[in-house]
Amino acid sequence: MTRKAWIIGASTGIGAAVADELDSKGWNVVRSSRSKGEIRIDISNDESVFEAARKYQDQHGDFDLVLVMAGFWQRMSAKHFDLNVFKEHNNTNTVGLARCAAAVLPEMISKNRGTFVGVSSVAGFRGLPGSSGYGPSKAAQINFLESLRTDLVNTKVKVQTVSPGFVKTPMTDVNTFPMPFIISAERAAKIIVKGLYKEKNDIVFPIPMAISMKLARLVPSSIWPKLFKKG
């Protein structure tokens, strides 16, 4: 039986690359985004998400693999804090992921099968300069997915978290700051799909960035801000 994957946020970047990678491995891939795809979806809108989930079930049946890869990023520092930008990060990244979970997990739980995957970021591991909107939304995603995973540990429903470092995409092309260890979207897709096949709870990459950010968690909070002092 052909395996089915619904990729939400598949128009460009990592989502498009993951869709291509799964397609090359024989998966029946349904691509969704706000502007393109067989099923249009706007994860910042409740009605859009639940309607898209209904369309998917009508056209393709059960949810085998659902990957939520859509997201929002805008650099924002404390000196230029904008509450509306913070809310947009939260509504798209955090609540958007929760909307998708609410739309597909009940069916997965009912059938006791399926895999739900959320794409977060290593930016959620620790507070970073210019990330006062993006970082908190990604930290919330990581915690949310882990909470779901603990709730579903005695079922056959799997929840996986993807936390990339810098990946070359239209989203990162606008960045004017250094992006260490940056990799291509195609390379990222291969790592993600390999992690999906291995059923890893957390897929963190590239390795140098994963190690750096995991070590960063060990730095005392009294010292962490001082690492970013200039001069």
Model regions: which residues?
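C-terminal helical subdomain
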Residues: 161, 177-213
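Substrate-binding pocket helix/loop in short-chain dehydrogenase/reductase
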Residues: 77-88
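Active-site helix of classical SDR
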Residues: 101, 137
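Rossmann-fold cofactor-recognition segment
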Residues: 34-47
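N-terminal Rossmann NAD(P)H-binding glycine-rich loop of SDR-like oxidoreductase domains
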Residues: 11, 19
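Residue(s) in the substrate-gating loop at a strand-loop-helix junction
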Residues: 121
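Conserved NAD(P)H cofactor-binding loop of Rossmann-fold oxidoreductase domains
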Residues: 69-74
